[in-house]
Amino acid sequence: MKIINFTQYKNVYFFGDPHGINIIYDILRSYVNEDNISDNSVIFSCGDNGIGFDDIKTDSNKLKLCNDICIKHNIQLILIRGNHDNPDLYNESSPLNKSNISLVDDFTVVKTEDYNIICIGGAISIDRTDRVLNKTYWKNEGTRILDDELKEEIKSLDFNIDIVCSHNCPTYQKPKDEYPLTSDNPLFNWSIWDSKLLDDNFIDRSNLDAIHKELSMSNKIKYWIYGHFHNHYDSIESKPKFICLDMYYKNIKILKKTNNSLIYKTGPDILDIHNINKFNQIKIKEI
C-alpha cells in the first residue's frame, strides 16, 4: 500500500465518472473557484477517466492541460481507475503522472488534514462484448481481490481510514441487483450476449463486500463514495454513509417537470466532503 501525504490540504472534493480527460479539463476549468471547488484542495475522480483509449502521448498532452490548472489553483487531483481505464497506467510509475495529478494504484491511501482516504478502483464492463480488448476494454478491469498481504498491511496501519473512494460498490448498496433481473435492467440485456456477465459482476461486487468487512475490523469508516452507476444514490441511515456520484452531463438530464418548474441535472456531480448535503449537479429552473 502506498501512502500519499497531503495533510497540508483541508478541502476535499469528489466527482463522478467523467468518461474522458477532456471532461476532467472542463470540470477543472469551469468549476474551480466558481463556488463549487475551492483553491488549495484535493480532488478525487471516482473512476472511468478514459485513460488508455488514446496513445500515451495524446493522454499525456491532455493531462498536462489539466495539470496547468491544478498548479495555478494549488490542487492535487487523484484519479482512481474505473472499468473504462487501462489498469496498467494506474501506479506510482505511470508515465501519465504529473506534478499535481496522480493516477493511483488500488489501495493507495491519501492523507489530508481531516481525512484518510483509501482508493479502490475497478469494476466489470457490462458491455464488454461490444468492446475491443486492450483498446477499449481490459481483462484485469475488475476490483482487486483482497489477499493476505493486503489484509496485513491494512491491519498494520497506525491511523484510521475515514473514507473509501471506489469505482464500484458492495452488493448491498444501491443499485442492488435484485433477481430475477427484468428487461429494464441494462445488466440483464447485456447478459443475453455475455453468459458470464452476471456471475462476474456479482463476484466483483462481492469483492467489495469482503473489503468493507476487512476495513471495518480495524477502522471506523465514515463515508464510502463511489461512481460507476451513472446515477446519484445517497444512503440515509447506513454506517458508513454510502454516496454514489452521478456521471458528468454535458447537456441536461430531466428529473422532474411540473407546471412551474423543471428539475434537472447538468455538469459534474461534485461532493464537498465538508458539506455533504450540497451537490452541484441538481438544478431547478422556473418555467
What are these regions (language model features)?
Residues 115-206:
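Active-site-proximal loop/helix segment associated with metal-binding centers of metalloenzymes
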Residues 7-9, 37-40, 74, 114, ...:
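A general structural motif
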Residues 14-17, 43-48, 76-84, 103-105, ...:
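Active-site neighborhood of phospho(di)ester-bond hydrolases with catalytic His/Asp-centered motifs
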Residues 76-80, 95, 173-272, 281-283:
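Conserved beta-sheet core of the metallophosphoesterase superfamily
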